[in-house]
Amino acid sequence: MPTVDDVLEQVGEFGWFQKRTFLFLCLISAILAPIYLGIVFLGFTPDHRCRSPGVDELSQRCGWSPEEELNYTVPGLGATDGAFVRQCMRYEVDWNQSSLGCVDPLASLAPNRSHLPLGPCQHGWVYDTPGSSIVTEFNLVCADAWKVDLFQSCVNLGFFLGSLGVGYIADRFGRKLCLLLTTLINAVSGVLTAVAPDYTSMLLFRLLQGLVSKGSWMSGYTLITEFVGSGYRRTVAILYQVAFSVGLVALSGVAYAIPNWRWLQLTVSLPTFLCLFYYWCVPESPRWLLSQKRNTDAVKIMDNIAQKNGKLPPADLKMLSLDEDVTEKLSPSLADLFRTPNLRKHTFILMFLWFTCSVLYQGLILHMGATGGNVYLDFFYSSLVEFPAAFVILVTIDRVGRIYPMAASNLAAGVASVILIFVPQDLHWLTIVLSCVGRMGATIVLQMICLVNAELYPTFVRNLGVMVCSALCDVGGIITPFMVFRLMEVWQPLPLIVFGVLGLLAGGMTLLLPETKGVALPETIEDAENLRRKAKPKESKIYLQVQTSELKGP
């Protein structure tokens, strides 16, 4: 009986139907970009100072320039460690009193300004920006600055929680239904975020968007890889992730054109509604239909693929079946990932690598956005490096292998982070170059580890292994905003030190993994244990006691 791959070899592994469907689904990948990294613009924190009643009137009466107003009324100017004082403290002075002159008005109150009492901001802040962000609208600065971190962490928390439930929905009710449902919720929650009346409701809508957006991306990823033949699956998977990079590049331009965070959020959310047209444009996965014993529907879709590709369907198409062993199946458990020495080692290393690449990727972007410069151009330049990163993967993955390029990329990200510590502020171009090098390294690792993770586990625990290890990616995303912004308050280079240590450790630990280039996917525990060495004699094979499907109810 022919399998889906057998039929695709005859009707086209990547014909007109697959190309059209791929382009449709790439919109889902691009839409994830502003959800994942839109915080750079939505949560942009401009320079700010306390609003003091009477200062505007005095400045207008005296005809001060903006520089003179700052010099006369804001504490902490010129001090190397005066950022907090300048942005979060104010002189406890009544600026409405008539005795204040126009030239150094505070001189009449104290011979030295350092003797004047300071107090926290009580009347809001003045922001030096023509646009708006969630920071300027909800005053998320000083004591409330951590709320910006929480805003971003909620997205990653949603990714973490949603990927578990959405995966079940996709397997139980179908890829297409899961894609449409998550897309609808994603679009609605994005619009609700844009019109949220307060910080709390905005946070809840953002969490809801995180719960479904990554699941929507994963559903699109699964659909397109199940529509193409095995020879194109890896390339299509990488190019699907390139669409995410296209979304990042577009985001920098849209954010520049729309400096108001509410209109920006609305603009990047509305295109998601277009994906609802997938109901008519994208069919269900024939592989999933076969797994649900809906063979007639699967045959109709394969026949449609043949027609769209201009090919004749095979004569035995009606006998289409899944290419899988229908005999006894093993039921994996979490303990199986740690039960044997090599599986245990691989699991711990992969979990650390997923965590590290998430911290480096997101952390370098957030750090660059928080350290001055033109945030739009900096984000644009660093997004462009993701395209050569994809090219490097396509060129090296079957020529050089997986492990050495991945280790080198981790090391490059770590070294670039360490060098950034010593770059003077006036060499901003060098800061951008090093940030781009680090981001390129993290991008390569983030895309390659998906493949390596699957290739190191035996068949019956492969999906579980990928799910458990990749969950650390979302855990890294949850803590990264706090790691970047709060550590910068302690000492600005401190996040870069953490990034450097993580990158160097990850580079070394990657070399402890076996190379999987040209190696068949392990089917058994013994295969996974012996990836580095020749098979042992039969009597020394490792067996695991696992449950079988017979032990479960119908």
Curated annotation (Swiss-Prot):
Q: Does the keyword Disulfide bond apply?
A: no
Q: Does the keyword Oxidoreductase apply?
A: no
Membrane topology, as annotated, equals:
Multi-pass membrane protein
As for PTM, the annotation reads: Phosphorylated.
Could you tell me which residue ranges are on the Cytoplasmic side of the membrane? 1-21, 171-176, 230-237, 284-347, 396-402, 453-464, 514-554
Q: Which residues cross the membrane?
A: 22-42, 150-170, 177-197, 207-229, 238-258, 263-283, 348-368, 375-395, 403-423, 432-452, 465-485, 493-513
Q: Name one GO biological process term.
A: thiamine transmembrane transport
One Pfam match, by short name? Answer: Sugar_tr
Q: Where is this motif: Proline-rich sequence?
A: 283-287
What is catalysed by this protein?
A: 1-methylnicotinamide(out) = 1-methylnicotinamide(in); dopamine(out) = dopamine(in); serotonin(out) = serotonin(in); (R)-adrenaline(out) = (R)-adrenaline(in)
Q: Which GO cellular component term is one of those annotated? A: apical plasma membrane
Provide the disulphide bond pattern.
Answer: none
Lineage: superkingdom: Eukaryota
Q: What does this protein do?
A: Electrogenic voltage-dependent transporter that mediates the transport of a variety of organic cations such as endogenous bioactive amines, cationic drugs and xenobiotics. Functions as a pH- and Na(+)-independent, bidirectional transporter. Cation cellular uptake or release is driven by the electrochemical potential (i.e. membrane potential and concentration gradient) and substrate selectivity. Hydrophobicity is a major requirement for recognition in polyvalent substrates and inhibitors.
Q: What is known of its domains?
A: A large substrate binding region with partially overlapping binding domains for structurally different substrates is formed by several transmembrane helix domains (TMH) including TMH 2, 4, 10 and 11, and it is alternatingly exposed to the extracellular or intracellular side during substrate transport.
The extra comment attached to this record reads: Involved in the uptake of clinically used drugs including diabete treatment medicine metformin, neurotoxins 1-methyl-4-phenylpyridinium (MPP(+)) and iobenguane and platinum-based drug cisplatin. Also involved in metformin efflux transport. Metformin competitively inhibits OCT1-mediated thiamine uptake, leading to a decrease in hepatic steatosis. Plays a role in the anticancer activity of cisplatin and may contribute to antitumor specificity.
Q: Name it.
A: Solute carrier family 22 member 1
